[in-house]
């Protein structure tokens, strides 16, 4: 069986990029692999070794990308991440409000079709065969209705398609995706899994998914490699991995810890407003596209709300108004804890009353330090 990627006793030359043990890994023709493990366990560092980012001491990785005629590893292995789709990977200039500060849409604002054409041109020569591939990708991804859309107005699910299509124009032999399902609703996750399944079946493409949760492993995955405590476990079939996987505990916290949380001292709130959030006839618009139109919404003290809807429906936009991340919120009739927006308060005066967690927040607060060996 053809070994596409083979690593034997891999140890990086630089100590700060080393795993706890030498890495042994093989990826063979017909295998689609999930790399699974907890955050901070070493998955990203393992992928860096797979793609040859860090030179090894003894044995360099062996690659056999045939039938591909391309020789460079970077041409045959494409690694895309989905930690955040606004701003490039490891972009230190990214900030939390970046998505909402892109207010000016003019003739210089890129549209999907132009950016995809740019990616197509950079990936190779313009030939009838490659144009046929481009057309096939557009049809497979159902992207026709997205081509004339501004890139900054794409939803999370649409951005995944955009980024994936851009990568496939280069016809890689191996496609590695880091957390492809993060931040997607259930329906969009299922659609993406079906799309990846089709790619795995119809193309000479090996797919490797980097996942934090074993529940995200799609049906088309054939093998699993677990990475934890900076160690790469032996590869096993998906069935073997699922059979030996530890059951999910019925309780995430012990009764003792739960009681300690219940017994935490009550903190009297500074504000006693009956209306925590109040919006009146709120309208959010980018260019000709209306995201929210004449929205009335009141959240009363003690209520618990769930915002549900498809990707692109406006959920994140609505939260950006509450948290004052969207500059358009200052032109809207919005009150938080009884204080109308735009009454002289700073963004931090607003945020100090709100607890907020999101992929974009982690992205903007990321550190860029290697693990110590």
Task: Please annotate each region the language model reported.
Residues 5, 18-22, 277, 290-294:
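Conserved structural motif at the start of ABC-family nucleotide-binding domains
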Residues 36-38, 308-310:
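The feature captures the beta-strand-to-loop junction immediately N-terminal to the Walker
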Residues 44-122, 319-373:
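ABC ATPase nucleotide-binding domain signature region
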Residues 129-146:
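Conserved ABC ATPase "signature" region
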Residues 150-154, 158:
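Conserved ABC ATPase signature
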Residues 163-164:
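Hydrophobic anchor residue at the start of the ABC signature
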Residues 194, 219-220, 227-256:
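Conserved beta-strand-loop-alpha-helix hinge in the C-terminal portion
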């Amino acid at each position: 069986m053809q070994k596409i990627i083979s690593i034997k006793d891999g140890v990086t030359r630089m100590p700060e990029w080393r795993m706890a043990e030498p890495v042994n890994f093989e990826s063979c023709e017909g295998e689609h692999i999930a790399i699974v493990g907890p955050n901070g366990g070493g998955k990203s560092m393992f992928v860096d070794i797979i793609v040859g980012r860090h030179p090894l001491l003894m044995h360099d990785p062996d690659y056999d990308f045939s039938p591909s005629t391309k020789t460079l590893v970077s041409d045959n292995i494409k690694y895309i991440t989905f930690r955040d789709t606004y701003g490039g990977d490891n972009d230190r200039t990214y900030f939390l409000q970046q998505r909402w500060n892109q207010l000016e849409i003019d003739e210089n604002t890129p549209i999907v079709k132009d950016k995809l054409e740019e990616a197509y041109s950079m990936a190779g020569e313009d030939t009838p065969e490659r144009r046929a591939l481009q057309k096939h990708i557009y049809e497979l991804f159902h992207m026709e209705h997205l081509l004339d859309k501004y890139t900054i107005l794409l939803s999370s699910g649409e951005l995944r398609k955009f980024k994936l299509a851009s990568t496939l124009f280069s016809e890689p032999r191996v496609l590695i995706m880091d957390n492809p399902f993060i931040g997607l609703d259930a329906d969009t996750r299922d659609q993406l899994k079906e799309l990846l399944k089709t790619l795995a079946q119809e193309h000479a493409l090996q797919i490797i998914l980097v996942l934090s949760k074993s529940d995200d492993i799609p049906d088309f995955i054939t093998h699993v490699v677990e990475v934890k405590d900076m160690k790469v476990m032996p590869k096993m079939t998906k069935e073997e991995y699922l059979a030996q996987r530890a059951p999910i505990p019925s309780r995430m916290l012990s009764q003792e810890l739960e009681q300690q949380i219940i017994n935490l001292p009550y903190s009297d709130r500074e504000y006693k407003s009956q209306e925590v959030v109040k919006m009146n006839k709120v309208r959010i618009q980018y260019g000709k596209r209306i995201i929210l139109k004449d929205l009335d919404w009141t959240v009363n003290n003690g209520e618990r709300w769930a915002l549900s809807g498809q990707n692109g429906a406006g959920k994140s936009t609505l939260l950006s108004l509450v948290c004052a991340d969207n500059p358009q919120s200052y032109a809207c009739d919005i009150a938080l804890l009884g204080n109308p927006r735009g009454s002289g308060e700073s963004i931090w005066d607003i945020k100090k009353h709100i607890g907020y967690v999101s992929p974009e927040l982690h992205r903007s607060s990321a550190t860029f330090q290697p693990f110590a060996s």
